[in-house]
């Protein structure tokens, strides 16, 4: 059990998140950024504005226990790469640094992707995976990637190396765009899932691949054509998910052939989808987080901060 009391902050698109890890238990709070009906996202300037307004509200939900924090973890960029940057993370970074100075505790920075992976492992009670290499899929509106994760002994807890990705649209983008076509709220994943499950047809889908990388740009056009032809919403939703899942399945198969039968982890909001979870668990024995730890959250940075403070991944 993690003993360190740690605070996690994450201000990504499209959720303001805070989490408190105390006595091994996680309290996680979050608030979606407001997106107008019919729109499929926010400009970064708007995201920064809404995070600035919402973060104090989200922090208030954690109550006075924050004063017992001994470390803070914060998401500072989308991915663990030098060219990875997004202005919305500056809101969380600024809050973390101010709190760290006020409380006299260390602030540890991690990528948003590392946070997703850590939250999924924590939720599935599989932090032991950090002791050896594994494949981690991060599926969201901004990312559709598989990375090779490996233990790190320089204080980072673990490192990630890009192994496969979408060459164009991301899985979450496709789902959100098709959802908006169907008149669903944004983000659309949680609303598209039950529609797809209600479809009585068996949809045959073939993935468009280049090596282990996938292409998802054609899925939106297929679904748009179905909508224009008057197809039931359930059929459109099921078609969307069938093609997305076929692509992820093909990526996983190619990577297992390349790297061997490594453990496979799924994180990110798209990983909440029930059809994806069922297929990947049955076929690959994949590890999934609880849905609330799949979507954007700050549990991952809190877990990683605690691991850092407890010496995990540090050279002895």
PLM features: what roles do these ranges have?
Residues 1-2, 105-135, 303-307:
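Conserved phosphate-binding catalytic cores of ATP/NTP-utilizing and phosphoryl-transfer enzymes
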Residues 2-4, 11-12, 27-29, 128-132, ...:
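A short helix-loop
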Residues 6-49, 155-162, 288:
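Short glycine-rich, Thr/Ser-proximal phosphate-binding strand/loop in the N-terminal lobe
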Residues 32, 50-65, 247-252:
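Short, well-ordered amphipathic alpha-helical segments that serve as non-catalytic structural scaffolds
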Residues 60-97, 101:
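Short beta-strand-loop/turn "lid" adjacent to the catalytic site in phosphate-handling enzymes
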Residues 74-77, 140, 265-273:
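Glycine-rich beta-strand-to-loop/alpha-helix junction loops that act as flexible
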Residues 116-120, 289-316:
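Glycine-rich phosphate-binding/hydrolytic loop that grips phosphoryl groups
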Residues 190, 194-263, 270-281, 285-288, ...:
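A contiguous, well-structured pocket-lining segment that forms one wall/lid of small-molecule binding clefts
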């Amino acid at each position: 059990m993690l003993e360190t009391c740690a605070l996690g902050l994450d201000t990504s698109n499209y959720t303001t998140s805070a989490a408190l890890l105390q006595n091994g238990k996680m309290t996680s709070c979050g608030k979606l950024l407001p997106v107008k009906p019919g729109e499929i996202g926010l400009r970064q300037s708007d995201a920064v504005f809404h995070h600035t307004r919402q973060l104090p509200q989200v922090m208030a939900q954690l109550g006075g226990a924050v004063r017992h924090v001994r470390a803070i973890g914060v998401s500072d960029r989308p991915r663990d790469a030098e060219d990875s940057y997004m202005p919305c993370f500056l809101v969380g970074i600024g809050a973390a640094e101010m709190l760290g100075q006020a409380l006299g505790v260390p602030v540890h920075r991690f990528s948003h992707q590392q946070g997703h992976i850590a939250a999924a492992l924590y939720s599935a009670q599989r932090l032991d995976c950090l002791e050896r290499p594994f494949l981690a899929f991060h599926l969201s509106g901004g990312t559709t990637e598989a990375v090779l994760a490996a233990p790190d002994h320089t204080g980072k807890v673990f490192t990630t190396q890009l192994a496969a990705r979408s060459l164009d649209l991301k899985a979450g983008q496709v789902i959100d765009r098709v959802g908006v076509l169907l008149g669903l709220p944004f983000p659309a994943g949680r609303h598209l899932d039950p529609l797809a499950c209600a479809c009585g047809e068996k949809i045959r889908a073939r993935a468009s691949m280049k090596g282990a990388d996938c292409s998802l740009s054609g899925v939106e056009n297929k679904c748009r054509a179905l909508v224009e032809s008057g197809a039931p919403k359930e059929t459109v939703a099921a078609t969307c998910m069938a093609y997305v899942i076929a692509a992820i399945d093909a990526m996983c198969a190619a990577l297992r052939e390349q790297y061997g039968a490594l453990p496979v982890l799924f994180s990110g909001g798209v990983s909440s989808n029930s059809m994806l979870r069922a297929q990947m668990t049955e076929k690959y024995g994949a590890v999934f987080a609880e849905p609330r730890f799949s979507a954007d959250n700050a549990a991952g940075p809190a877990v990683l901060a605690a691991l850092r403070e407890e010496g995990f991944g540090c050279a002895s």
